[in-house]
Curated annotation (Swiss-Prot):
Residues 20-50 form a propeptide. It is found in: Fimbrium; Cell outer membrane. Transmembrane segments: none annotated. It comes from Porphyromonas gingivalis (Bacteroides gingivalis). This is Minor fimbrium subunit Mfa1. The record marks 50-51 as: Cleavage. The keyword Membrane applies. A lipid is attached at residue 20 (S-diacylglycerol cysteine). PROSITE patterns: PROKAR_LIPOPROTEIN (PS51257).
């Protein structure tokens, strides 16, 4: 399979912030009797990700539309924790095409060395954990801890509110010496504390630039001599996303590894079961599908505001540890319709729209009648199940990784899904008939386990193309041409043919 086109857009935002004097939850701030100076805090999401985040051919940036509710600052020093939570009434928020700034007035503090933490849109769970800290060491532990990404209602890392992204944002704390006797007027120059933060979540989306014919997309197989032959059509394309982390680190690790980075399934048994993938990854959005967005030109930054998306959490591993069963994927579901030449004799006339389709692996033909398919496609050697793949209700499936690292799918080794990025997967061409179901949903031998993800799209066990979760990412057969775009919130461009 040839890699044709893939776009990745790394997402970033810029915030400028200076705090005002306001008490928040937790220990009381320094009183005016002990405060001897003023300071301000400047918060920013960088215009470019750090090295490693901004790889894979950047081609642009997207400023984003963020909903800022509050900003919480923790100033640690002299054995005290000064907590200040500032609502929108205390903030001047300016959102531009590429940056967002948040500005507050300087506030009074005691001079000396301080460690400053800042969180935008803090969630109740995170706030409770940080405010429970009574000393610098406990606060550091709480700030570096992992929290539920989406399962705690009201404490999700990202929600869509009035077409705006409401996301928790955080970054590395800054250690800085606060100078004494600095007035409020001079605080932004002499006692300004710069903090870089990132959005904790990722945005995933899907588009298609292949043009439909009579409402459906032609699947064009390549024959000898690079001749394209239409073998079927696919319509009613909808997508979902899964296998992203259930937890996230409030403070991103220096190596950007996520909480379950060490989970590397070595077998299907490792993938399944209560201690397998279901323990670490979220599959809850598989049934909540979005229609694939049609484009008439290559995906670009200008399309970002108009394309529907889903939020996912950071999901990464060491470079050599990516497997099909631990990597975030987008799943596409469509309705398959073979062309006349792909039907066995008499079967097309007998087929009723929406019924099951049966593909014979011996004849290479489709059947409307299962018994006819089984008879014409016996098991190898006459023993076992007939060599027939069932496409239930004519449904067909394709999957794609969010952020593969090379231009050739046969050499993929990793697909890191990093926070503060927008990943768009664009389908530019279908080459092959897809899978009979979704192969990447873990199961549990215990039927009473309530945590077992629901997989309404179980693949046919006879489908020879169904991959195993312990396999590395490279694939030898592919099904569609995909453009993956990651948008700073930095745009990256890849060509991939599936």
């Amino acid at each position: 399979m040839k890699l044709n086109k893939m776009f990745l857009v790394g997402a970033l935002l810029s915030l400028g912030f200076a705090s005002c004097s306001k008490e928040g939850n937790g220990p009381a701030p320094d009183s005016s009797s002990t405060a001897d100076t003023h300071m301000s805090v400047s918060m920013s999401l960088p215009q470019h990700n750090r090295a490693g985040d901004n790889d894979y051919n950047p081609i642009g940036e997207y400023g984003g539309v963020d909903k800022i509710n509050d900003l919480t600052v923790y100033v640690v020093g002299d054995g005290k924790i000064d907590v200040r939570k500032l609502s929108t009434a205390d903030l001047q928020v300016n959102q531009g095409a590429s940056t967002t700034s948040i500005v507050t007035a300087p506030f009074q503090v005691k001079s000396g060395e301080k460690t400053v933490y800042a969180i935008v849109n803090i969630t109740p769970k995170v706030e409770a954990a940080l405010n429970a800290a009574t000393n610098a060491a406990d606060l550091k532990v709480a700030y570096e801890a992992a929290y539920a990404a989406f399962s705690d209602a009201g404490s999700e890392i990202a929600t869509l509110v009035n077409n705006q992204d409401q996301m928790i944002m955080s970054g590395k704390p800054v250690v800085q010496t606060i100078l004494p006797n600095v007035s409020a007027a001079n605080a932004s120059v002499q006692n300004k504390v710069p903090i870089i933060v990132k959005r904790a979540a990722i945005r995933a989306s899907m588009t298609i630039t292949q043009q439909p014919v009579n409402g459906a997309y032609e699947i064009k197989a390549l024959r000898p001599g690079n001749v394209e032959v239409v073998i079927a059509t696919v319509s009613d394309l909808k997508w979902s996303v899964a296998q992203y982390e259930k937890k996230y680190y409030l403070q991103q690790k220096d190596n950007a590894l996520s909480p379950a980075a060490s989970f590397v399934p070595a077998s299907t048994n490792d993938y399944n079961g209560a201690n397998g993938a279901m323990k670490h990854y979220d599959y809850s959005q598989l049934a909540n599908r979005i229609t694939v967005h049609q484009l008439n030109a290559p995906y670009s930054v200008t399309d970002v505001p108009n394309v529907a998306y889903k939020y996912v959490s950071e999901t990464t591993h060491a470079d050599n540890d990516y497997r099909k069963g631990n990597t975030t994927y987008i799943l596409v579901k469509g309705k398959l319709k073979p062309v006349a030449a792909m039907w066995a004799d008499g079967e097309q006339a007998a087929y009723q729209e929406g019924g099951d389709l049966f593909l014979g692996l011996v004849t290479g033909k489709f059947y409307a009648n299962e018994a006819n398919a089984n008879a014409a496609n016996p098991a190898s050697g006459g023993a076992g199940n007939p060599r027939v793949v069932t496409y239930k209700a004519a449904a067909v499936y394709y999957y794609a990784w969010l952020n593969p690292n090379t231009l050739d799918p046969t050499t993929w080794t990793m697909s890191p899904a990093r926070r503060n990025n927008i990943y768009n997967v664009n389908i530019s061409k279908f080459r092959n008939i897809g899978l009979s179901g979704n192969p990447f949903v873990p199961t549990d031998p215990d039927p009473n386990n309530p945590d077992t993800p629901d997989n309404p799209d179980t693949p046919d066990p006879e489908d020879p193309d169904t991959p195993n979760p312990e396999e590395p990412l490279p694939v030898q057969k592919t099904y569609m041409v995909v453009d993956v775009t990651v948008t700073p919130w930095t745009l990256h461009n890849y060509d991939i043919e599936f």
